[in-house]
Amino acid sequence: MLFPRERLLELEAERLAPYAQKARDTRGREHPEPESPYRTPYQKDRDRILHTTAFRRLEYKTQVFPNWAGDYYRTRLTHTLEVVQVSRSIARALGLNEDLTEAIALSHDLGHPPFGHTGERILDELMRDHGGFEHNAQALRILTHLEERYPGFKGLNLTYEVLEGIATHETPYAPSFKPLYEGQGTLEAQVVDLSDAIAYAAHDLDDGLRSGLLSPGELAEVSFLRDLAREEGLDLERLTELGRRVLVRQLLGYLITEATLATHRRVEEAGVASA
């Protein structure tokens, strides 16, 4: 049985929540192009991002620990893949568009320079007389200008909603870049923002314990971590390597569940009935 694009769009309309961004309602691309016979617009965007040079380069960019510190620690690439997993889990539970969510999640860190947030801060200082440096703006520049894959235009010619999701990406440590876009973006984009913070919380704890920068005893000072440990029968003062993995897994599951429930509650309270 084949599922052509038209049927995929119908399935979205039938199965997704009223407030989900449907691919059939996209605001389109800057440059008109033929539609794929078996992929929706957001599926095409996701695939294009995966095949970029910028995406492959994430493997060698620092998350917290530099690449040479060991192959256990996260890089921008592994962090991105974790954000994709968290984002899709939340999007699926809320009835949002997983393809759009995944495309935004895959591209949300493409503009980061090497050496983590310190590298970005120093680069911003060096570029102050030339407009500064901001990684969301750089991600847009990569996807709309620097990646050259098509003879008729520069960039990947992604849909409006994916580019909007990158421009409006915002976390406590990284403000959004919104000169071309208004509002908070789609709910799918907001889920990626939330998932970014969730992935950070879980893997920074994991990497911190693994490296010795955090001691198991320090975790006992955090009440909900004590509760999570108690549920699994873990002693935070004598945390084994297996215990660390169990704790991180529990933390990740807890945050995903709480984020999903809180988002659903807010959507219901606000009476959101459309994208």
Residue ranges of predicted features:
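Histidine-centered, transition-metal-coordinating active-site segments
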Residues: 1-80, 84-90, 98, 119, ...
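Short coil/turn segments at secondary-structure boundaries
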Residues: 67-78, 91-92, 107-114, 127-130
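Aspartate-rich (DDxxD/NDxxD/DxxxD) Mg2+/diphosphate-binding motifs
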Residues: 100-129, 135-136
